[in-house]
């Protein structure tokens, strides 16, 4: 490992040990705070994922999207038939 990374990890470990040793009984330790932060980030990411999925599904099912897909399909078939007739 690079020295800077090693030093940073050592400092974080010392901070965790120092914080857990001096915290009051009712106050959450640094590890508990980090664990809670991790849970909050996970819930946030899950919510964003669900909302994004719902928005994309709604966009996919919209009238504009359906009409656009149909238009492209029809025109692609026409071009394909023209090319087939031209080069056959």
Swiss-Prot record:
Recorded coiled-coil stretches: none
Subcellular location: Secreted
A Gene Ontology cellular-component term: high-density lipoprotein particle
One GO-annotated biological process of the protein: negative regulation of lipid catabolic process
Protein keywords: Lipid transport, Secreted, Signal, Transport, VLDL
Signal peptide positions (record): 1-23
InterPro entries: ApoC-1_sf, ApoC-I
The keyword Nucleus appears for this protein: no
MF-aspect GO terms: fatty acid binding; phospholipase inhibitor activity
UniProt xrefs under PANTHER family: APOLIPOPROTEIN C-I
Family: Belongs to the apolipoprotein C1 family.
Function: Inhibitor of lipoprotein binding to the low density lipoprotein (LDL) receptor, LDL receptor-related protein, and very low density lipoprotein (VLDL) receptor. Associates with high density lipoproteins (HDL) and the triacylglycerol-rich lipoproteins in the plasma and makes up about 10% of the protein of the VLDL and 2% of that of HDL. Appears to interfere directly with fatty acid uptake and is also the major plasma inhibitor of cholesteryl ester transfer protein (CETP). Binds free fatty acids and reduces their intracellular esterification.
Protein name: Apolipoprotein C-I
Organism: Alligator mississippiensis
Upper taxonomic lineage: Eukaryota, Metazoa, Chordata, Craniata, Vertebrata
